[in-house]
């Protein structure tokens, strides 16, 4: 899919600003999440989606477009909603990490344009209108730099290979293949892991960190994003009140070792009073993580039997018999 203009930054649900630089998977997640959270229902949904995919931020007077734009800006760090200022530092970080994706003079011009933007009230319309002229003037530069150019991104996916979650690959499968590769003695452990057995060894903790960060339950800064967990519960029509209590309890016992936080929260949820709801939500997240655009053309209706069937199919693929 052609990623939409760099202009956007999303707003509803969790709005955890990521830490750059960003790889193609991270930007794909950002753009599709911002689309999902802001697309209108009804006859305008598909035409609007088609434009956003082409980096055309229209209709410009639509609250949906404006909030989509703000969402991307916030998630990438181009706009700080707390300071209510634009910040070009991520542009330089991105160029330093991916120098082949831009020309130095054009990147500097883009960064200067962003840095010169005035303080702006933290609302969708104001942020969108402030950034839109910069987007239009530097669209090609930002599109290339933030992995919106299909051809450039294709080359990066090929270069990174097994070191990045590939398109149409679930993040669970990516992590499983990374830490329990096919043909290795460790592969058999997936038969237990995929049935929610919590292991206590270093390898499993690394694997869990990979998954929990991949589905954004844990941020790059090793912080719990409770809103992301709650979002998945709502996707399977589960009440979040009991979940909130469980997460608060888990938080009170959070380890100081950053490397064990993902494992701690996973174990805490799997062994909690909401474990069945968590497993159901987690399974559905696995299915949806195969296609980040899962809910874009239209919001999908959750079907537990269908998800169970899909997960069993993945089990058969990942767990050697």
From Swiss-Prot:
Swiss-Prot/TrEMBL keywords: Allergen, Antiviral protein, Disulfide bond, Hemostasis impairing toxin, Platelet aggregation inhibiting toxin, Secreted, Signal, Toxin, Vasoactive, Vasodilator
Disulfide bond entries: 34-71, 67-124, 175-210, 191-319, 250-268
Tissue expr: Saliva (at protein level). Female salivary gland (at protein level). Detected in the head and thorax of the female mosquitoes, where the salivary glands are located. Expressed in the distal-lateral and medial lobes of the female salivary gland but not in the carcass. No or low-level expression in the adult male mosquito tissues.
Disruption phenotype: Mosquitoes show longer probing times when fed on mouse or chicken but not when using an artificial membrane feeder or mice deficient in leukotrienes. Reduced blood-feeding success, defined as the percentage of engorged mosquitoes after a fixed amount of time, when fed on vertebrate hosts.
Signal peptide location: 1-17
Protein location: Secreted
A Pfam entry, by short name: PBP_GOBP
Binding site for noradrenaline: 176, 194, 207, 283, 286
One Gene Ontology CC term in the entry: extracellular space
Protein origin, superkingdom: Eukaryota
Entry keyword annotation includes Zinc: no
Chief location bin: secreted
Entry keyword annotation includes Secreted: yes
Annotated function: Modulates blood feeding of female mosquitoes on vertebrate species by binding and sequestering different mediators involved in the host response, such as biogenic amines and eicosanoids. Binds serotonin, histamine, leukotriene B4, leukotriene C4, leukotriene D4, leukotriene E4, adrenaline and noradrenaline. Does not bind tryptamine and U-46619, a stable analog of thromboxane A2. Exhibits vasodilating activity. Inhibits agonist-induced platelet aggregation but not blood clotting. Inhibits noradrenaline-induced smooth muscle contraction.
Quaternary context: (Microbial infection) Interacts with envelope protein of dengue virus type 2.
The family this protein is said to belong to: Belongs to the PBP/GOBP family.
Name recorded for this polypeptide: Long form salivary protein D7L1
Source organism of the structure: Aedes aegypti (Yellowfever mosquito)
Taxonomic lineage of the native organism: Eukaryota, Metazoa, Ecdysozoa, Arthropoda, Hexapoda
């Amino acid at each position: 899919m052609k990623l939409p203009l760099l202009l956007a930054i999303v707003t509803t649900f969790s709005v955890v600003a990521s830490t750059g630089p960003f790889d193609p998977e991270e930007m794909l997640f950002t753009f599709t999440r911002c689309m999902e959270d802001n697309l209108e229902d009804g006859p305008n949904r598909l035409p609007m989606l088609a434009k956003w995919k082409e980096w055309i931020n229209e209709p410009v007077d639509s609250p949906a477009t404006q909030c989509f734009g703000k969402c991307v800006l916030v998630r990438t760090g181009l706009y700080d909603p707390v300071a209510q200022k634009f910040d070009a530092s991520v542009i330089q970080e991105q160029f330093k990490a991916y120098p082949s994706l831009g020309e130095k003079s054009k990147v500097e011009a883009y960064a200067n344009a962003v840095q010169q933007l005035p303080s702006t009230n933290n609302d969708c319309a104001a942020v969108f209108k402030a950034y839109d002229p910069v987007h239009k003037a530097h669209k090609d530069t930002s599109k290339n730099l933030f992995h919106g150019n299909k051809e450039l991104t294709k080359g990066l996916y090929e270069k990174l290979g097994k070191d990045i979650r590939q398109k149409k690959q679930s993040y669970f499968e990516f992590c499983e293949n990374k830490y329990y590769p096919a043909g290795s003695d460790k592969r058999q452990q997936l038969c237990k892991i995929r049935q929610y057995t919590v292991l206590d060894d270093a390898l499993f903790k690394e694997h869990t960190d990979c998954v929990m960060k991949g589905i954004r339950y844990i941020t790059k800064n090793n912080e719990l994003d409770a809103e992301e967990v709650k979002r998945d519960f709502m996707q399977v029509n589960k009440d979040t009140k009991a979940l909130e209590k469980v997460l608060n309890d888990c938080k009170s016992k959070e380890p100081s070792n950053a490397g064990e936080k993902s494992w701690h929260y996973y174990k805490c949820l799997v062994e909690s009073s909401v474990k069945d709801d968590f497993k159901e939500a987690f399974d559905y997240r696995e299915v949806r993580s195969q296609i980040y655009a899962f809910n874009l053309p239209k919001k999908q209706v959750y079907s537990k039997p269908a998800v169970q069937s899909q997960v069993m199919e993945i089990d058969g693929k990942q767990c050697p018999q």
